[in-house]
Amino acid sequence: MNATRAEYPLASLYIGDLHPDVTEAMLYEKFSPAGPIMSIRVCRDIATRRSLGYAYINFQQPADAERALDTMNFEVIKGRPIRIMWSQRDPGLRKSGVGNVFIKNLDDSIDNKALYDTFSAFGDILSCKVVCDEYGSRGYGFVHFETQEAANRAIQTMNGMLLNDRKVFVGHFKSRRERELEYGAKVMEFTNVYIKNFGEDMDDKRLKEIFSAFGNTLSVKVMMDNSGRSRGFGFVNYGNHEEAQKAVTEMNGKEVNGRMVYVGRAQKRIERQGELKRKFEQIKQERINRYQGVNLYVKNLDDGIDDDRLRKEFSPYGTITSTKVMTEGGHSKGFGFVCFSSPEEATKAVTEMNGRIVSTKPLYVALAQRKEERKAILTNQYMQRLATMRAMPGPLLGSFQQPANYFLPTMPQPSNRAFYSPNPVAPVRPAPQWASHQSRPPQYQPPAPLMRAVPPRRMHSNISTMKQASTQVPRVPLQSQRVANIGTQTAGARAQVNASIMRAMPHYKYSCGVRNVQPIGSSAHLQQVLEPAVLMQGQEPLTASLLAAAPLQEQKQILGERIYPLIHEMHPTLAGKITGMLLEIDNSELLHMLESPESLHSKVEEAVAVLQAHQAKESAPKSAPQSLI
């Protein structure tokens, strides 16, 4: 094994066939007796974090890795024998096929260890595996030798030998492409013919009489069920290809026993499955191409909208070939599909109908996507959101961050210090106070934005000293300092709120040389200490990346807190209802409305018109109809 050790100087081992519950700690406990370990990594799915069933272990010394490979291979961890081999970073060595041997017709009792023990006599083995499924061994496996000479010796010695009373085939490994090329050449010279759809009144003798007219038949077989009746298909094997081809040409489509029979080349199951799969994919692709760019997905439908109403709403934009509202138990599921005759008509419908309010609900209209495409897009969005959250700076003083409803005095800072928010989104947000079915009480005000403490500009003392000092500062709850209408204050009013809070606070200063903080007497100095530490989180600019960093269940809530005050300025009595209606629109369009007052005003007026029409419809029977506004 010296040559092997020189070839893999990093002493890295691949551990395969692991149980999904095996962790790095279990592997360390198992392999640490072999020698000092530098690192262990169980490979996991990037999205679900589930184990992929293999791991890598890096030893400090190649001799320790070699010892683990020799003594621990095929040992059982959590009921499964593990498989150990040298880690090969170069995929060319694995895919070249040099030294790789294929064995088939194995007995079910032969596992990885038995195969390894049998073939290790011919040379050093890089990897050894018996292919299994949920039912056990599939009867074949692979042995990858370190050299081609060892592989040749194994083939010469073991091919045709009995292994557990079964004659095994041992040969050079061939890639799937090589096998398909060889099989394709043999297919053109077929001699075996498949016949189906001749009914139950057929046996071997009669089938032979029919097909012996085309040549010498070596074998004829009608497939039977357990009761001895024909299953309606069978096989005829001819002596040469010309006779078989003549039988196919003459008999395919002819009537036998009053039935039109199919006669063709006999195929292996895997070949037939592959052909059916190709046909299915072809039909699927044709369907995708036919509906590409013309099929629309419509969601947020009112429960009263059916297929006819959906067609009526979209018919002004072009010729509709089909409409369908998806239902379950006779009730609408809230979404459906509209298919146009051309992509131009579909694009126009998306432009005009997306966001339009139909029966008190704004529609979401977009090009329909296949499940695979939608899943890929959602996965990509999730990964981008995850990367954005990881890229954002973490809390500088996170080890002793105060509760959200407490104010923490901080160290003196220059007045021009930029605001630093430890977390881009508030950790706790109150539940939404609006609903689409009822207006908000006139006296309601949006929740007060949380106040954050700004970390110091320089930190010369160690963290433990700062933590001890911070625990000595009394916490003054903001509950006693609440100010009415804090969500709609002007900049001057916010400054007065800050000043009133600071006047109520005890005076402290921070000293890195002592454990206890001391009060100071200068109120002017207090103003310099505390003013940069308070900022309304609700005034932070809301961007797409900041919104994406928030949990999905909080994103609508964040948008609602931003959009409600703007709607309240236009229609105070209907702000709650309008906010609830607009929040059903896509987040990207809501962000656009926050940036564009004209777009927001247009949507608000459209919602008001719908509400007025709805009330007028309800109050029509009354003698004195009343307006909403």
Swiss-Prot record:
Keyword presence, RNA-binding: yes
Keywords on record: Cytoplasm, mRNA processing, Protein biosynthesis, Repeat, RNA-binding
Compartments (UniProt record): Cytoplasm
Top-level taxon of origin: Eukaryota
One GO cellular component term noted in the UniProt record for this chain: cytosol
NCBIfam families hit by this protein: PABP-1234
Protein name: Embryonic polyadenylate-binding protein B
Species this chain originates from: Xenopus laevis (African clawed frog)
